[in-house]
Swiss-Prot record:
Family stated for the protein in its record: Belongs to the UPF0237 family.
UniProt xrefs under SUPFAM superfamilies: ACT-like (SSF55021)
UniProt name for this protein: UPF0237 protein lmo0533
Organism in which the protein naturally occurs: Listeria monocytogenes serovar 1/2a (strain ATCC BAA-679 / EGD-e)
CDD domains in UniProt: ACT_1ZPV
PROSITE patterns: ACT
Residues making up the signal peptide according to the UniProt record: none
Residue ranges constituting the ACT domain according to the UniProt record: 4-78
Upper classification of the organism: Bacteria, Bacillati, Bacillota, Bacilli, Bacillales
């Protein structure tokens, strides 16, 4: 099972490390990542393997949102099938 994670906010030291460490803590593997900084704003999109999580997905979402607050960015995760359904033309 996979999920799409997005991170958006003002660029700051430690965003990638903070997000990566939190994902490892939640037993989430990063499958693919794209990251850029546009005019001082950090943007990152990750494809994640969530098949090994031990918590409910809503709890994972809440913990990642909390980590985003700590890092002063917005972190959003959603199941891949939901992401795909929302972005079909």
């Amino acid at each position: 099972m996979r999920a799409v994670l997005t991170v958006i906010g003002k660029d700051n030291v430690g965003i990638v490390a903070g997000v990566s460490n939190k994902l490892a803590e939640l037993n989430i593997n990063i499958v693919d990542v794209s990251q850029t900084i546009m005019d001082g704003y950090f943007t990152m999109m990750m494809m994640c393997d969530i098949s090994q999580i031990t918590k409910e997905f809503d709890e994972v979402k809440a913990e990642l949102a909390g980590k985003g607050e700590d890092l002063q960015v917005k972190i959003h995760i959603q199941r891949e099938e939901i992401f795909n359904a929302m972005h079909k033309l």
